[in-house]
UniProtKB/Swiss-Prot annotation:
Full protein name: Nucleoprotein
Lineage, highest ranks first: Viruses, Riboviria, Orthornavirae, Negarnaviricota, Polyploviricotina
Annotated positions for site Cleavage: 7-8, 61-62
Disulfide bonds: none
Cited function: Encapsidates the negative strand viral RNA, protecting it from nucleases. The encapsidated genomic RNA is termed the ribonucleoprotein (RNP) and serves as template for transcription and replication. The RNP needs to be localized in the host nucleus to start an infectious cycle, but is too large to diffuse through the nuclear pore complex. NP comprises at least 2 nuclear localization signals that are responsible for the active RNP import into the nucleus through cellular importin alpha/beta pathway.
Family indicated by similarity: Belongs to the influenza viruses nucleoprotein family.
GO cellular component: helical viral capsid; host cell; host cell nucleus; ribonucleoprotein complex; viral nucleocapsid
A Pfam family hit: Flu_NP
Gene encoding the protein: NP
Feature: compositional bias, Polar residues: 1-14
Length: 560
């Protein structure tokens, strides 16, 4: 089936009947956007750790390796090569799975199945652990499981007259075969590609699920959700993962470590554990954007026997990050099924930026399709998909609405569930829909917190974490933050705490008319060279916060 046929899928609310094909013309009206070459990013940005900020090594005459920074053009070329190779790997896996129809290859769930299989196949530590545990289980008389294999649920398309639907099939692969195929395709170990996929899964989790249980477990208020980006990222995502993690996520990791150290006083005598703990705190310090926040982390780093006082300090730090936001990298991460289409989409540049025009142009050209679960509304599902791709779970909904020309709703108002279909819901004849929300305007992504305060808040999420660098007020619930400020500042670090609370109060006292990202504009999606900047229109009737009153499933309740 051609790409144009995908537009024919009816995008209504699913009930038990499969979707019917109806003649559609949206493919004809969608403009073909050719990606541009962006102006080189500033030197300031190239210092941050991310998949796009890599270095190459060259040999000196005496044979010693030195690090040479890549130019912006070299970076974009290497990123282009990475995403194209990921797409090639996806096509090879789909051939092995016997799924060759365009509709099957455009399906988000099939892309996720391949991504999960790849991550499982390349996680040698986990495989080793599973084998050892299974060996113990077998001795106790339990069933033997072959951990050299991994698999997933794919969806095969079935045509019935004018109706098309999808049926689930289980397919397994040898881990070693998958790993070899991936390394051969990438021409290396392909760690940057694996990290890219992990970030995509994390962004989708941030959008689809709440993390109130994870927050409460370490004594943090669920209203700090906007600081909790990247909370489901595995440790093996390394510095790339740290760059996209929110401050609250790192605070959570540190508090859990302190909890373990309090239960086992010998833990931090182990050099490996101590190094891991110090690394978390240093990453946290690097995230902080205010000297008062850094001073509080220094206080915790200097503690010989971390305990309750340190947990209180870190809790205050997390609260301060709602007002003075840390630096969180934002990236566009698309399903690898979209990267597989790059050769067919007329995407003829050999440069690609995950934070600029190219990624947004590719998103607009793509025709991704998703399985609809029982009760899902296709338009609402499209909103979830858009926010997942752009890592916009904690972005101001008014900004997203302005960029897409679609009124975005808070999570509690969306009639749809996450993209992962649990085993109990996998049935014959599942309907699907095109993810139809596209960008009408674009703006570069940001890694800054945009630290000027204003706006109104809600009872759930009380602050935003900016993703797009466009001038706007930063939404913040001042009332909710003031409740957080009423805490005891006595003790060993009264001055440090007092300074931080004063900074929060001073920031809160600013006029509500102050904007962040002064002078930054948006551009029409056809304006690849930023010729005509447009001021973003902020519609006051749309709520600021996606998780304002949350009714989403909790990530901890998932049954994979």
């Amino acid at each position: 089936m051609s790409n144009m046929d995908i537009d024919s899928i009816n995008t209504g609310t699913i009930d038990k009947t499969p979707e019917e094909l109806t003649p559609g013309t949206s493919g004809a009206t969608r403009p073909i956007i050719k990606p541009a070459t962006l102006a080189p990013p500033s030197n300031k940005r190239t210092r941050n750790p991310s998949p796009e900020r890599t270095t190459t090594s060259s040999e000196t005459d005496i044979g010693r390796k030195i690090q040479k920074k890549q130019t912006p053009t070299e970076i974009k070329k290497s990123v282009y090569k990475m995403v194209v190779k990921l797409g090639e790997f996806y096509n090879q896996m789909m051939v092995k799975a016997g799924l060759n129809d365009d509709m099957e290859r455009n399906l988000i769930q099939n892309a996720q199945a391949v991504e999960r299989i790849l991550l499982a196949a390349t996680d040698d530590k986990k495989t080793e652990y599973q084998k050892k545990r299974n060996a113990r289980d077998v001795k106790e008389g339990k069933e033997e499981i072959d951990h050299n294999k991994t698999g997933g649920t794919f969806y095969k398309m079935v045509r019935d007259d004018k109706t098309i639907y999808f049926s689930p099939i289980k397919i397994t692969f040898l881990k070693e075969e998958v790993k070899t195929m991936y390394k051969t395709t990438m021409g290396s170990d392909g760690f940057s590609g694996l990290n890219h996929i992990m970030i995509g899964h994390s962004q989708m989790n941030d959008v689809c699920f709440q993390r109130s249980k994870g927050l409460k477990r370490v004594g943090l208020d669920p209203s700090l959700i906007s600081t909790f980006a990247g909370s489901t990222l595995p440790r093996r995502s390394g510095t790339t993962g740290v760059a996209i993690k929110g401050g609250g996520t790192l605070v959570d990791e540190a508090i859990r470590f302190i909890g373990r150290a309090m239960a086992d006083r010998g833990l931090l005598r182990d050099i490996k554990a101590k190094t891991a703990y110090e690394k978390i705190l240093l990453n946290l310090k690097n995230k902080c954007s205010a000297p008062q926040q850094k001073a509080l982390v220094d206080q915790v780093i200097g503690s010989r026997n971390p305990g309750i006082a340190d947990i209180e300090d870190l809790t205050l730090l997390a609260r301060s990050m709602v007002v003075v936001r840390p630096s969180v990298a934002s990236k566009v991460v698309l399903p690898i099924s979209i990267y597989a289409k790059i050769p067919q989409l007329g995407f003829n540049t050999e440069e690609y930026s995950m934070v600029g025009y190219e990624a947004m142009a590719l998103y607009n050209m793509a025709t991704p399709v998703s399985i609809l679960r029982m009760g899902d509304d296709a338009k609402d599902k499209s909103q979830l998909f858009f926010m997942s791709c752009f890592g916009a779970a904690y972005e101001d909904l008014r900004v997203l609405s302005a960029l897409t020309g679609t009124e975005f709703k808070p999570r509690s108002a969306l009639k749809c569930k996450g993209f992962h279909v649990p085993a109990k819901e996998q049935v014959e004849g599942m309907g699907a829909a095109l993810m139809s929300i596209k960008l009408q305007f674009w703006a570069p992504m940001t890694r800054s917190g945009g630290n000027e305060v204003s706006g109104e808040g809600g009872s759930g999420q009380i602050s935003c974490s900016p993703v797009f660098a466009v001038e706007r007020p930063i939404a913040l619930s001042k009332q909710a933050v003031r409740r957080m400020l009423s805490m005891n500042v006595e003790g060993r670090d009264a001055d440090v705490k007092g300074n931080l609370l004063k900074m929060m109060n001073d920031s809160m006292a600013k006029k509500t008319s102050g904007n962040a990202f002064i002078g930054k504009k948006m551009f029409q999606i056809s304006d690849k060279n930023k010729v005509n900047p447009i001021e973003i229109p902020i519609k006051q009737t749309i709520p600021n916060f996606f998780f304002g009153r949350d009714t989403a499933e909790d990530y901890d309740d998932l049954d994979y």
